[in-house]
């Protein structure tokens, strides 16, 4: 019985030690552990549509771009700069539309968490 009591006591003390170390970390360290790459990527774009990481649905706010031109942009990446979109096989009307809205776009490095699978084409949001 005393052997069992010692083991349980040791386990409890170790658990408390680990919990104590975790709780005494500065909040900034804890927050850094909770943040993920997607949160960082969203913060990096400053409200603009990231051409290398956005889904086609992000283009709905720009009349005429969704779904055809948005699909071409999403599939045609990755891009080094916003103007690289104009190298795609676009109609004159699509080029005009892109020029009209290009100040609303930005380019960051592609993030695997945002580009995996077909989520950029169909991100599963339905009305």
Swiss-Prot record:
UniProt-annotated location(s): Cellular thylakoid membrane
Coiled-coil residues: none
Keywords (A to Z) from UniProt: Electron transport, Membrane, Photosynthesis, Photosystem II, Signal, Thylakoid, Transport
Chief subcellular location: membrane
Signal peptide: 1-31
Entry-linked InterPro entries: PSII_PsbU
UniProt record, GO biological process: photosynthesis; photosystem II stabilization
GO CC entries: extrinsic component of membrane; photosystem II oxygen evolving complex; plasma membrane-derived thylakoid membrane
Highest taxon of source: Bacteria
Recorded topology in the membrane: Peripheral membrane protein
Family: Belongs to the PsbU family.
HAMAP family: PSII_PsbU
Subunit organization: PSII is composed of 1 copy each of membrane proteins PsbA, PsbB, PsbC, PsbD, PsbE, PsbF, PsbH, PsbI, PsbJ, PsbK, PsbL, PsbM, PsbT, PsbX, PsbY, PsbZ, Psb30/Ycf12, peripheral proteins PsbO, CyanoQ (PsbQ), PsbU, PsbV and a large number of cofactors. It forms dimeric complexes.
Protein's job: One of the extrinsic, lumenal subunits of photosystem II (PSII). PSII is a light-driven water plastoquinone oxidoreductase, using light energy to abstract electrons from H(2)O, generating a proton gradient subsequently used for ATP formation. The extrinsic proteins stabilize the structure of photosystem II oxygen-evolving complex (OEC), the ion environment of oxygen evolution and protect the OEC against heat-induced inactivation.
Name assigned to this protein: Photosystem II extrinsic protein U
Species assigned in the record: Synechococcus sp. (strain RCC307)
């Amino acid at each position: 019985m005393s052997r069992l009591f010692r083991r349980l006591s040791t386990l409890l003390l170790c658990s408390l030690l680990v919990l104590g170390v975790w709780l005494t970390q500065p909040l900034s360290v804890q927050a850094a552990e909770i943040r993920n790459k997607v949160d960082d990527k969203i913060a990096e774009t400053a409200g603009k549509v990231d051409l290398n990481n956005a889904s086609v649905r992000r283009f709905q706010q720009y009349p005429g771009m969704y779904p055809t031109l948005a699909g071409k942009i999403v599939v045609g990446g990755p891009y080094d700069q916003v103007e690289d979109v104009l190298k795609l096989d676009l109609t004159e009307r699509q080029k005009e539309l892109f020029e009209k809205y290009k100040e609303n776009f930005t380019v960051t490095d592609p993030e695997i968490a945002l580009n995996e699978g077909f989520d950029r084409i169909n991100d599963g949001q339905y009305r």
